[in-house]
Amino acid sequence: MSTMMRQDYIHQVFEKQIDIAIENYKKLWKAVGDKVDVVFTCGTDFGSQESQFCSLDTFRELWLPHYKRMNDWIHQNTTWKVFKHSCGAILPILPGIIDAGFDIINPVQINAKDMDSVRLKENFGDQITFWGGGIDTQKVLPFGTPEEIHAHVLKQCEI
């Protein structure tokens, strides 16, 4: 609720946060250069088991401009790929995550609503890399036999 009621403040906070992040990425690039392939830029979860935490319109209004500015700087000034962490049912906002310039989404919580790995690959596989997750971490992994886990992982690898 506060996020929606105080959007100007949210933009001010994110603007400053991204200013600091870019300064830090400048230092990191100078220190490690292309010895790093991928950088983790944001750990904000945008999903629960059943839904995303905001609409695509809200994501585009509040987060996308700031993430895009940071990711554009990284892509224009380094060789790095950028990954975004978000658990949950994020299918409705995945187009915004892609538009913000993220190269990779991690993890892929296939137990969350509409996060079917085949569907994700078919619809977005040429636009973003799905890294990590991708296996059933709530039923198969904790409760499956070693054989069931092995079969499940191999099946997911075929996607």
Show which residues each predicted segment covers.
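Active-site loop segments of alpha/beta catalytic cores
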Residues: 1-159
